Regions:
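Bacterial Sec-dependent N-terminal signal peptides
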Residues: 1-22
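Polysaccharide-binding surfaces and accessory modules of carbohydrate-active proteins
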Residues: 21-35, 44-255, 271, 678-690
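Carbohydrate-binding surface patches
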Residues: 31, 224-226, 234, 631-675
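Glycine-rich, aromatic-flanked loop segments that form ligand/cofactor-binding clefts
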Residues: 86-108, 231, 236-249, 291-313, ...
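Short Pro-Gly-centered flexible turn/kink motifs
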Residues: 103-108, 275-294, 719-726
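Aromatic-lined carbohydrate-binding/catalytic grooves of carbohydrate-active enzymes
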Residues: 315-455, 464, 469
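Active-site neighborhood of glycoside hydrolase catalytic domains
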Residues: 385-387, 419-421, 425-579, 589-594, ...
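C-terminal beta-sandwich/jelly-roll accessory domains of carbohydrate-active enzymes
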Residues: 658-729
Length: 729
């Protein structure tokens, strides 16, 4: 009996020791579990990422070890959460540090962790420390249960005798073990943003990155879709959507290893960015935001949309302003009288605001084209003798708000600013200067430049507190890559420049929290969730051809809610009707950029009614759940709908792009309705003196019928559109 007691005591002690050695950290939403484990060697590993487990005790069944391949040591390494370089891991590290003594290796061991409630979810903080050097890494995870979104980032700091050099600095590292992986990426160019393409990931690395600095996303966007076991699909299959909150150079690395596991590594692009980190200085990586779904990209997108409106997007719960912009109507050629007339047109159209675009500033070097004036943010006296105050007054008299365009991060060599402060621009010494759009990028790593850029906005709002909106542009990538301010620390330019932008935006947000701003970068070359903490919306593309916009807006909708996406009715592709152009813009945040005088009486009446309908239904469009029903990538038609959270109201958009002769037309099957409710169908946005030919118009159907059988809404007409309102009875 005594021997049995001793044996049981020993077994209990061993069990307790193993439980302590295998500490599990659970990061959970309502649908997803991310399980991390502290192994007996003191290091932190990912043991599970997938559907949420119902039984809390089940997380103890996981082991940090992975299946070995030809290299037996793989079985002991496991999926380390934040692996350093230079030790035993053969694959891409999360962090690479050269210590002050030249040692290039890092191994981090678990110190402690804590969890606390934060707005909308739970924050988990995990502290790691190198056991040979005074270097610490802190991992942050915020899980948003209802939205099924996890946000994660890291901090690196040290207390060595001298600075260390950071060569890699990932936000996180995530692992997947499936038979196959399919990546959807979003390529871009001017007027060709958010173009979707997919491929199967094979052994080795696939890297998506950018090296453009300020206009960073001009060629590729900072988000992706990952299909697990099958290509990502809209309404079925396991998918991950991920995006990094960084307005500069980013890098996504997808590495399939020798045993078929996948590492996903989101990070600042380390290209030309060997960062010198001083003792006790904190290096914070960007936030990586991701969501998982077993029901395709549609559900995953709705997760991100809801999360963004609730927690990330500036004024995500607030209203948005419809507007009339003057750019495509006047370009640089305008005066006070013409602008006053356009403000009256804005009121007549029914929009909330008139937005004055480029060309209003510069005196010694007037901004009459794109060769001069950037940096000199005083109203041009020859065009606008009354300055901004006169424009604000005219807008007020017309009954609309007034907004204005700025590009404060840029400078023309032909400007008083450049004459006074040539050292404020990013320019190479001893080299011929290369100009993009005849301009240079101001060096936002320089605190004096940060003060100047903040002062541009501050001066306008201090002198004109009734200015209601800013369109903030950024047309040039960083060229001539050299910072006069950083001198011998050029490896920090790409990073400190972006951080400088954030410092400016934080000051603006703190002093003017209620002023909405549109993010623009020669179109949609800036579109990330860190910038959108400071902007209410972004300009998707300079391409406003409605057919091209269907593809562009479809792509951006994978990640961003309609509330954040600006779409304007313009004169691009006049072969299409004003109705078609307006219906395409109406699926996002609506605006206009054309002169009313070029519209016929019927076209103007149509636009006025469309604005009124959009305003009446904007809560559904901007704050409802989005369902992408028919993809333009799959054929000659597209359909998208929005449903209110209570399922009492929905708005359906259908677009015929280039139907084939005799093409078979299938019903559009709706989603997001209440199967038991009855819905009255009504086609809206009709041209004057025309009637709907929609067979379902003015009829009532059950939500069940509309979702299972659908509605015959497509036609064989070229560039034809419908907007259909559904109301529960």
């Amino acid at each position: 009996m005594k021997r049995l007691f001793v044996l049981l005591t020993a077994l209990f002690a061993l069990t307790q020791m193993n439980a302590q050695e295998k500490k599990n950290i659970r990061i959970s939403t309502d649908n997803t579990d991310l399980i991390l484990q502290v192994a007996p060697n003191g290091r932190l590993y990912q043991t599970y990422l997938g559907d949420k487990l119902l039984n809390e005790q089940d997380i103890n069944h996981f082991s940090y070890a992975v299946k070995g391949g030809s290299d037996g040591s793989v079985s002991t390494r496991g999926w380390e959460v934040y692996p350093g370089s230079g030790a035993e891991d053969y694959f891409e590290p999360a962090v690479a540090i050269t210590h002050h003594d030249g040692n290039p290796s890092s191994i981090f061991r678990y110190v402690s962790s804590e969890q606390k409630a934060v707005t909308g979810g739970t924050e988990t903080v995990i502290h790691l420390k190198d056991d040979q050097y005074p270097v610490e890494v802190t991992l942050f995870y915020i899980a948003y249960p209802k939205e099924n979104v996890i946000k994660t980032w890291s901090e690196i700091k040290h207390n060595e005798k001298k600075p260390v050099t950071l060569w890699r600095y990932a936000s996180t590292m995530l692992y997947f073990s499936d038979h196959s992986y399919y990546l959807t990426e979003f390529s871009s160019d001017w007027a060709k943003e958010a173009q979707m393409s997919s491929q199967q990931l094979q052994f080795g690395k696939k890297v998506i990155d950018t090296k453009l600095g300020s206009r960073a996303a001009m060629h590729t966007h900072p988000f992706f879709e990952l299909g697990l076991e099958q290509p990502a699909q809209e309404a079925q299959g396991r998918v991950m959507l991920g995006t990094i909150g960084w307005t500069g150079n980013f890098q996504f690395t997808f590495e399939v290893d020798n045993v078929g596991n996948l590492r996903v590594i989101p990070a600042i692009n380390p290209y030309a960015s060997n960062y010198e980190l001083k003792p006790n200085e904190v290096f914070t990586t960007p936030e990586f935001i991701f969501t998982l779904s077993n029901n395709g990209t549609g559900e995953a997108s709705r997760n991100l949309h809801a999360w963004a409106r609730n927690y990330q997007l500036k004024d995500g719960q607030g209203d948005r302003l419809t507007l009339l912009n003057n750019w495509e109507n006047t370009y640089f050629k305008f005066n006070e009288e013409l602008l006053a007339e356009l403000m009256k047109e804005a009121k007549h159209l029914g929009v909330d605001m008139f937005l004055l675009d480029d060309g209003w500033f510069g005196n010694k070097y007037p901004r009459n084209d794109d060769h001069a004036g950037l940096g000199d943010w005083d109203a041009m006296k020859s065009k606008l003798p009354g300055g901004i105050p006169a424009l604000v007054k005219s807008a007020k008299e017309a009954g609309v708000k007034f907004g204005i365009w700025i590009e404060p991060e840029m400078v023309n060599p032909k400007s008083e600013l450049f004459e006074t402060h040539p050292d404020w621009a990013i320019t190479l010494p001893n080299r011929e200067t290369y100009y993009y759009r005849n301009q240079l990028v101001l060096d936002l790593s320089n605190p004096k430049v940060q003060d100047f850029v903040f002062g541009v906005v501050d001066k306008i709002l201090t002198e004109n507190p009734e200015v209601a909106f800013f369109k903030w542009d950024c047309n040039s990538p960083i060229t001539n890559v050299y910072s006069p301010y950083l001198k011998n620390k050029q490896g920090q330019l790409y990073i400190d420049h972006v951080r400088g932008i954030y410092k400016v935006l934080e000051r603006i947000k703190e002093k003017y929290p209620n002023v909405p701003m549109m993010l623009c970068s020669g179109g949609g070359a800036r579109c990330d969730y860190e910038a959108l903490k400071y902007y209410t919306e972004f300009w998707c593309s300079d391409n406003t051809d409605p057919i091209e916009r269907l593809f562009i807006q479809w792509g951006f909708s994978q990640i961003f809610p309609a509330k954040a996406m600006c779409a304007h009715v313009t004169s691009w592709n006049k072969k299409t009707s004003v109705k078609f152009r307006t219906d395409v813009a109406s699926m996002c945040k609506l605006g206009f950029d054309l002169g009313l005088k070029e519209l016929s009486a019927d076209e103007l009446a149509y636009c006025q009614e469309a604005v009124a309908n959009w305003t009446r239904l904007k809560k559904v469009i901007l704050d409802g759940d989005q369902y992408r029903l028919v993809s333009p990538y799959d054929g000659n038609h597209m359909s998208i709908m929005y449903a209110s959270p209570d399922k009492n109201k929905a708005v359906l958009y259908t677009y015929d792009i280039h139907p084939r002769f005799g093409e078979k037309l299938l019903p559009v099957k709706l989603q997001g309705l209440d199967a038991k409710k009855m819905y009255k169908v009504k086609e809206i946005n009709l041209m004057p003196n025309s009637k709907s030919d929609l067979a379902a118009n003015e009829k009532t159907y059950s939500g069940d019928y509309l979702m299972k059988v659908g509605m015959n809404a497509f036609t064989t007409n070229q560039a034809f559109s419908r907007v259909i309102e559904l109301t529960a009875e």
